[in-house]
């Protein structure tokens, strides 16, 4: 098993946090039964499951996933580390199967996400793409879902013993830099993700429960950086 996973060179942290040196993805065994079918597709909000749950989880996604390694909890420990995080800046769902973005310590080969998952063999995956697939107000998520579905199928084929949880596209701030990004599209894409999860047997993590202001329909105050898209430390803390 590799000692470290190095993010794509574009995923450069903007701030630093103390990384827990003992954190590691705990491998699932070939007898591990993924996805408890008694749990509803949309996972309900629950109490904090503790650090062991986080350390047993492989987080996959775009620059917001990178931020899980950049911010720390109140003990000074990063929410996730390079050992259980595959976050790539500017990546969308269409690149899951094709983009060679991951390197392992002592190995010069670049791996796609499915190939990296096969090497890490996690017990659980929380995957979040979609922010880089947005643009305009169209509510037609057909292409987005087809790309996501293909990526998830490739991950499942590479390592079929992990529970897969699809994380919602996070809400935007009303005062965002790119006004071509709309909550109309975010909501439509998230609804399509729920349907995909229901049809394909994945679970859906509705992060809007903690990130969205129900009164406005946008992200809660101070939950994004100044661009109105990337999650702030406050938001990541609430997420975890």
Which residues does each predicted region cover?
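N-terminal secretory targeting modules
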Residues: 1-60, 64-70
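Conserved SGNH/GDSL esterase-like catalytic core that processes O-acyl groups on lipids
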Residues: 51-146
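Loop/turn elements at helix/coil->beta-strand transitions in domains of secreted/extracellular proteins
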Residues: 53-56, 120-125, 159-164, 199-203
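Alpha/beta-hydrolase-fold catalytic nucleophile elbow
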Residues: 128, 167-168
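Charged helix-capping and loop-helix junction motifs
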Residues: 141-151, 183-189
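Catalytic His-Asp segment of secreted/periplasmic serine-dependent ester chemistry enzymes
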Residues: 171-240
């Amino acid at each position: 098993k590799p000692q470290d996973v190095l993010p794509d060179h574009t995923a450069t942290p903007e701030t630093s946090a103390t990384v827990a040196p003992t954190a590691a993805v705990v491998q699932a065994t070939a007898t591990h039964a993924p996805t408890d079918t008694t749990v509803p597709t949309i996972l309900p909000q629950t109490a904090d499951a503790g650090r062991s749950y986080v350390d047993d989880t492989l987080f996959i996604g775009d620059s917001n996933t990178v931020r899980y390694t950049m911010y720390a909890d109140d003990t000074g420990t990063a929410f996730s580390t390079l050992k259980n995080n595959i976050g790539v800046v500017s990546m969308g769902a269409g690149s899951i199967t094709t983009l060679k973005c991951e390197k392992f310590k002592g190995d010069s080969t670049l791996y796609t996400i499915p190939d990296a998952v096969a090497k890490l063999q996690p017990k659980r995956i929380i995957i979040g793409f979609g922010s880089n697939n947005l643009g305009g107000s169209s509510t037609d998520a057909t292409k987005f879902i087809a790309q996501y579905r293909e990526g998830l199928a490739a991950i499942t084929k590479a390592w079929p013993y992990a529970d897969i949880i699809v994380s919602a596209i996070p809400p935007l701030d009303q005062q965002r830099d790119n006004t071509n990004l709309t909550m109309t599209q975010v909501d439509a894409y998230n609804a399509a993700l729920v349907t995909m999860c229901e049809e394909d047997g994945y679970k859906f993590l509705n992060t809007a429960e903690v990130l969205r202001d129900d009164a406005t329909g946008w992200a809660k105050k101070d939950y994004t950086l100044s661009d109105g898209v990337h999650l702030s430390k406050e938001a990541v803390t609430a997420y975890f």
